[in-house]
Structure formats: structure tokens, C-alpha cells
Amino acid sequence: MMGKEEEIARIARRLDKMVTKKSAEGAMDLLRELKAMPITLHLLQSTRVGMSVNALRKQSSDEEVIALAKSLIKSWKKLLDASDAKARERGRGMPLPTSSRDASEAPDPSRKRPELPRAPSTPRITTFPPVPVTCDAVRNKCREMLTAALQTDHDHVAIGADCERLSAQIEECIFRDVGNTDMKYKNRVRSRISNLKDAKNPDLRRNVLCGAITPQQIAVMTSEEMASDELKEIRKAMTKEAIREHQMARTGGTQTDLFTCGKCRKKNCTYTQVQTRSSDEPMTTFVVCNECGNRWKFC
């Protein structure tokens, strides 16, 4: 007999196939099966079924499928919210028992002294606490905005990620790297938020949510490193084009009055012809207006 986790994973795989084939036939039956199952946060995180349901919701044009998928995601979000609330309570409550325990053991100073070095021991320095706490208003506001960015498009529900904990860790890394909350810190936070919310670059957000990109990494990544693959290719092509045009401008070219500049309407131009395609195709002509600097090309 198939276990609950295996059954949910099987449904997730079938939903993924429907998304790949762009066919939602039978989706309602699978979604109803999921609705009837008592799904825990552990099952949500281990099977990643939320990602499959969310992908189906985005692709489907069937209103009934969309509505049921949204209902499931909403109910699973409550599991995450409950988990977040418990984590916050633990974060608030953990220091109190420690201090009260220290107080109860205070009568013997010789016992209290050796315990002090253990609190900031090496593991606490090299690893982050579950939820780094700060009382700074600016830092807390930045954490809220990072949380909102991570929650874009409900990917956190599908992945089963704790956005508040993640945002706190990311902000902590940024603060440690910059050292204060001045303009450099704010610009760093702002650029993370912008890239995490970018609808054209969902992979960055998903990689952060699932841990493929750690808080330490996202905290120091450049705009180029955070960019989508598509934008990276565009930037690469633009750089190549700029280098080529610069090299052509330095070669001088041939001065002519055969071309009319579309910008200043003068005929004082310099042109260069280059074989940019295969040898049996026409050469590309690059033209520079010597009057206003306007550039254009044609084959």
C-alpha cells in the first residue's frame, strides 16, 4: 500500500506532466484528492506539491481548476503562517528561560562563570540563529519588505519556505557586511527587493526560497549576478556590439557624402564594411555621421 507521502508525490508528478503537456484533463480529480488529504507542513515541504499546484493554477484557463488550486494554496499558507508564529514565539521566549535559569543558578558564582563563554561559542558565531533579532526600526522595516518580496507569487507556499526567517537572515548578512544602516545598506536592501520581486526573473526568488542560493550569497550578489539568464544574454550581446563599434570607430573607415544622416540631415559621414555573416551574404555597412556622431548600419 502506498504511503501518504508517496501518494502526494505521485499526484505532484501527474500535475507536472499536465503543465508540461499544457493539458488540464483530470486535474480536478487530482486537486480534489489533495483537498481530501490531511497535509502537514512536512509533507508540503518534502513533496513540493505546492509548486505543482501553483504551476497548474498559473497555466490553466479553467475557472474551476483555478479556484480549487487557489483554495488549496490558501489553506497550505495557513500551515506556514502557524509555523512562522511558533518560530516567533520561540524567538521571543528562548532568552527568557535562559536568563531565569541563570538566575536560579546564581548563588554559586564558580558555577556561573564557566557558562558565560558557552553562549557566544564558535557555532553561534559561524552559524545564524533561527531568527536573528533586532530592535532597530530601520532594520525591522527592511526585513518586512524583504519578506514581502520573498512572498511574491506564492512561491514560498509551494516550496514551504519560512520567509520571515529567510528575510531576517538576509538582512543580517547585509548588515554585517555593510556595518551600518546608511545609504549603502539601504541601496543594497533595495536592489535585493527589486530583483526578488522581478516577474521576469522568478528563478532567483525560487533559488533563494529553496536554499540553492544562501542568505550569505544573496546578500552580496551584484546586479549582474542576480539578473535573469535572458538579461545576462542581452547584456553580453550589447557588450560585444559596443566593443565592435568601438573597434570600427578606431579604424577610421572611409569618408563619403553618399549617406544622409537621419538625425542632422548632413552628408559628412564615414563608413566601414564588415563581413558579419557567412561569406556568401552581403557585408554589413556601419556608418558614422562626422557632424553629430549618429551611428547606423545596414546590409
Curated annotation (Swiss-Prot):
The modification Phosphoserine is found at residues 60, 100. The keyword Cytoplasm does not apply. This is Transcription elongation factor A protein 2. One of its GO terms (molecular function) is DNA binding. Residues 86-128 are annotated as: Disordered. Coiled coil: none annotated. Belongs to the TFS-II family. It is found in: Nucleus. The keyword Phosphoprotein applies. Necessary for efficient RNA polymerase II transcription elongation past template-encoded arresting sites. The arresting sites in DNA have the property of trapping a certain fraction of elongating RNA polymerases that pass through, resulting in locked ternary complexes. Cleavage of the nascent transcript by S-II allows the resumption of elongation from the new 3'-terminus. Interacts with the basal transcription factor GTF2B. Interacts with REXO1. Testis and ovary specific. Zn(2+) binds at residues 261, 264, 289, 292. One of its GO terms (biological process) is regulation of DNA-templated transcription elongation. SMART domains: TFS2M, TFS2N, ZnF_C2C2. InterPro entries: TF_IIS-typ, TFIIS/CRSP70_N_sub, TFIIS/LEDGF_dom_sf, TFIIS_cen_dom, TFIIS_cen_dom_sf, TFIIS_N, TFSII, Znf_TFIIS. Residues 138-254 form the TFIIS central domain. There is a cross-link at residue 58 (Glycyl lysine isopeptide (Lys-Gly) (interchain with G-Cter in ubiquitin)). A zinc finger (TFIIS-type) spans 257-297. Keywords: DNA-binding, Isopeptide bond, Metal-binding, Nucleus, Phosphoprotein, Transcription, Transcription regulation, Ubl conjugation, Zinc, Zinc-finger. GO terms for cellular component: centrosome; ciliary basal body; nucleoplasm; nucleus; transcription elongation factor complex. Residues 102-116 have a biased composition (Basic and acidic residues). Transmembrane segments: none annotated. Its main location: nucleus.
